[in-house]
């Protein structure tokens, strides 16, 4: 696992796609995947160095808020290796 995990949660798929696009374009991060939470909520996840993930989450959150609603965003620096078990298998 890389040094950080970044998450942006949006209301609707369009905002999630916009966030994912902005995140990977704005910083050197890898797209981990997305999760449909329910009630229209979608969470997009990226990995990379702490600084890159922070920049990506900021960019993704800003981009998603233009086309939709951002519910939450968070960066987990140095997540525990057990977190790997709950990430999408494509990671």
From Swiss-Prot:
Residue intervals of the BMC domain: 4-88
Keyword Transport: yes
Lineage: Bacteria, Pseudomonadati, Pseudomonadota, Gammaproteobacteria, Enterobacterales
Predominant cellular place of this UniProt entry's protein: other
GO cellular component: propanediol degradation polyhedral organelle
CDD domains membership: BMC_CcmK_like (cd07045)
Gene: pduJ
GO BP: any one term: propanediol catabolic process
Subcellular location: Bacterial microcompartment
Domain of life: Bacteria
Induction field: BMC production is induced by growth on 1,2-PD vitamin B12 medium.
Family annotation (Pfam families): BMC
SMART domains assigned to the protein according to its UniProt record, in alphabetical order: BMC
Practical applications according to UniProt: Artificial BMCs can be made in E.coli by expressing pduA-pduB/B'-pduT-pduU-pduN-pduJ-pduK (in this order). Enzymes can be targeted to the BMC, and appear to be encapsulated within it.
Protein name stated in the entry: Bacterial microcompartment shell protein PduJ
Gene3D superfamilies in UniProt: 3.30.70.1710
């Amino acid at each position: 696992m890389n040094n950080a995990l970044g998450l942006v949660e949006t209301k609707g798929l369009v905002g999630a796609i916009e966030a994912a696009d902005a995140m990977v374009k704005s910083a050197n991060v890898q797209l981990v995947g997305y999760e449909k939470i329910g009630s229209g909520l979608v969470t997009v996840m990226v990995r990379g160095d702490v600084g890159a993930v922070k920049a990506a989450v900021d960019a993704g959150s800003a981009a998603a808020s233009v086309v939709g609603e951002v519910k939450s965003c968070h960066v987990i620096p140095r997540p525990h290796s057990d977190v790997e078990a709950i990430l999408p298998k494509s990671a």
